[in-house]
Amino acid sequence: LEQVTDSTVDDIDSPVIVRKYNSDEKISVFYGSNTGNSEAICDRIQETLGEDIIDLFNVSDTDPNKILEYNHIIISCPTWYDGELQEDWIEFLPKIAALDLNGKKIVMFGMGDQEGYADYFLDALGIIAEDLIKAGAKIEGKWPADGYDFNKSKGLMPDGKHFYGLGLDEENQSELHDSRLEKWFAMLLSVFSITAE
């Protein structure tokens, strides 16, 4: 798992306070969503950074080769039941994992239930990250595991202190979404070299 970089929100202190952004490259967001929770966060990403920067793709009806058109990518991966991928990701992941993703910079966020499924919290983050790393992608934006209460997670990096990406819990910690997303957006600006006006 040497393709995980050192960039982390631990080093980000300043909040996102501006609303107009510029980027030399388009950023794609690939998501799967049954309940609409993940899709709502993806819509928020596009609304915050702008439609001229963010392209949204629901993996249920997206050609896997579309990911090859972007170097900067955001992956949304909710965890279902006992550590399973969301149903559309079950089919989509093997297809993109078979592609050459060298040079692709990927930031991830996952959604899970740390109380109802404490042994599988954010497992999808780890499942997807490992496959993308094997395909040559670089995973950026590790997220501190402090502030969550769970038993086990495949979403944890080998250091045991960070997730492969942002973790959101709609069922138990929705009141923390705003503060977590604000720090995460600040990290995105750095990772993807997005400038703010």
Q: Where are the language model's segments positioned?
A:
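A short beta-strand-loop structural module common to alpha/beta enzyme folds
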Residues: 52-63
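FMN-binding flavodoxin-like domain, especially the glycine-rich phosphate-binding loop
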Residues: 1-25, 37, 48, 52, ...
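Short, flexible active-site loop motifs that bind/organize anionic cofactors or intermediates
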Residues: 28, 57, 171
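Short conserved loop adjoining the S-adenosyl-L-methionine
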Residues: 66
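N-terminal beta1-alpha1 ligand-phosphate binding loop
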Residues: 27-44
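Short, surface-exposed acidic/glycine-rich loop or hinge patches that mediate macromolecular interfaces
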Residues: 32-36, 61, 79
